[in-house]
Amino acid sequence: LRTHHATVRMRLVRAQVRRVLRVSAAAGGQTAFSDGFPLLLISEASLSDFNSRVSSPLPMNRFRPNLVVAGCGAYAEDQWRTLRIGETTFHVVKPCSRCKITTTDQETGYRGEEPLTTLSTYRRKQDVKAPCGDAVDVFFGQNICHQQQGRVSKGDAVYANFWQYPWYLGGYWHFC
């Protein structure tokens, strides 16, 4: 762990390994060591669109996703309800509301205003039709839960099933 002024000493503090998820849409789901959901999915196209709006592009690691998908349009993940990758099916729970941790450069430890300043101009609750969250929240990526255990490998095709709400397109979609 790097800091600007000193060495940081750390130790593992045991905590309850499993927590019940806060959103009822996660039907019986549990998480451990994560903020609120076991997995975060973001598309490369969404990051590319975001980076086209800022003067200094940010790397994907600033958003800390577990799964990164390619071959779809920007923010296509906003419309997915379930997806299958490899042997595993995932349930899309809700858009990920972003916190100040995303403003920290992981290489240097310095904090800035991005990505929250730019995301707040076009990714608020009303812009992404988020089922929960405050009007001041900004969203980037989707919180997802796996429905069963299975193997996911780099390069696997992703099959997405869309939400069937008026603001979303219906259907079944394959990419990659």
Locate the predicted segments by residue.
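Metal-cofactor-dependent catalytic cores
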Residues: 1-176
